[in-house]
Design a protein with these regions (language model features):
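N-terminal type II signal-anchor transmembrane helix
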Residues: 1-32
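Alpha-helical membrane-targeting segments
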Residues: 18, 22-30, 176-199
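C-terminal capping alpha-helices of c-type cytochrome domains
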Residues: 21-23, 120-136, 149-175
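Electrostatic cytochrome c docking/interface patches
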Residues: 30-53, 188-216
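The canonical Cys-X-X-Cys-His
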Residues: 48, 55-65, 126, 161, ...
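Extracytoplasmic
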Residues: 53-56, 105-107, 140-142, 217
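Detector for the c-type heme attachment site
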Residues: 61-67, 131, 146, 166-167, ...
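Gly/Gly-Pro-rich "capping" loops immediately C-terminal to redox-active cysteine motifs
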Residues: 65-123, 141-155, 178-192
């Protein structure tokens, strides 16, 4: 009987070690960022501005908001990040109801600042983060960043968004690293999925299909 117990315990230990090795070495699922270099044309930047501000809501989420005004418009400096959410946060606006957050999450600076923003990221790394939920360092993003929605953004539109982000005024704005509680910290690594097929926008002349597409990718 004792031998059976020992074998069972050893089997459990081995299974745990194998599971941990798989988790530590294989997650999050990811592919290398593409080496794409996006054209910073005026047309691309303007298209990206429309999408980032009005559809994907990048600017609203990554800027402080004035909740004393209707709709809580973003305030300067635009795109420089927001205060952290923690268990003690008194959430307001779009974050209402997110008290007791499982750890600490700080909305990042997405301006092209080299040290604290996206300035040191490649275009491909930004696209991979937005669509696939994996950051520059290969870690899974917390799904408050809706990459599971943005994976449907067409390639041309995604490139336009990056062109706009590159055109923003760089702001030096440090945000603390996240600290996510167990088991959420492990789940965050499970959710990202590689995305390697082209995404196409519908024909602009088909207003119904175009509207459906925008409604699908809208935040």
């Amino acid at each position: 009987m004792r031998k059976i117990v020992v074998r069972v315990v050893l089997a459990i230990i081995v299974a745990i070690l194998l599971a941990w090795t798989w988790y530590a070495t294989q997650l999050p699922r990811q592919r290398p960022a593409t080496d794409i270099k996006i054209e910073a044309s005026a047309e691309n930047i303007e298209r990206g501005r429309y999408l980032a501000v009005n559809v994907l809501q990048c600017v609203d989420c990554h800027s402080e908001r004035d909740w004393g005004l209707y709709g809580g418009p973003p305030v300067e400096p635009i795109g420089a990040g927001r205060a952290c959410m923690t268990r003690k946060t008194i959430a307001a606006g779009v974050n209402a109801g997110q008290e007791n957050f499982p750890g600490r999450l700080c909305i990042r600076n997405i301006t092209p600042d080299e040290e604290t923003g996206l300035g040191s990221w490649s275009d491909g790394e930004i696209i991979r983060a937005v669509r696939e939920g994996v950051n520059k360092d290969g870690k899974g993003l917390f799904p408050i960043m809706p990459y599971f929605i943005y994976k449907h953004v067409a390639d041309d539109d995604m490139q336009a968004v990056v062109a706009y982000l590159r055109s923003m005024q760089p702001v030096k704005s440090v945000r603390p690293e996240r600290q996510i509680d167990f088991p959420m910290n492990m789940l965050v690594q499970l959710w990202p999925e590689p995305f390697d097929s082209p995404a196409m926008a519908p024909d602009h002349s088909d207003s119904v299909a175009r509207g459906r597409y925008l409604a699908t990718v809208a935040r």
